[in-house]
Amino acid sequence: MDVFGRNPTAKEGEYFRNNIWYWRPLANLCQSVAPKICAGCEHWQSNDGDGLDAEAALALAAVLEGLLADGTIARMVADRDRYLAGLPDETCELCDGKGVRTDEIAVNAGMDKQVITEEGHPRCGQTGWCNSCDGRGTKRPFLTHYPCDVENVAEFAAFLKSCGGFSIC
């Protein structure tokens, strides 16, 4: 997401960027730790120009900085990482857990004839592959593709301090 400062007072308040994978957990974290402040933005997960005014942005920056300083954000990120690591793999929906796609698109792409040559792969030497699970039949849950880290939260807090309010575009 592209997040633009509405009335920046410093360079770091002009623009903040996260791809959708990083933005979603960051926005969720903000809403979790400061729900009343964040309520001023209804559409955190869309790029329709919604955002917070200058007062709310400064208030959110203060909350995030306090939680960064006392280690709360680091603990939240570590707890989230442990939770995600503990999630079981899911059966791949494209190959029904077989590790081989046989639908028309896959056959046209030659996936049903592809030999797996990667050493250490559980199906090494076998014919047939799935591009969704790398021919394994299972894959990590979709939620695990959304990273969250302390550095990203700190960068967003720095943006918030000098953005003069922001719009998510």
How should these model regions be labeled?
Residues 1-169:
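Acidic (Asp/Glu-rich) sequence patches and key acidic residues
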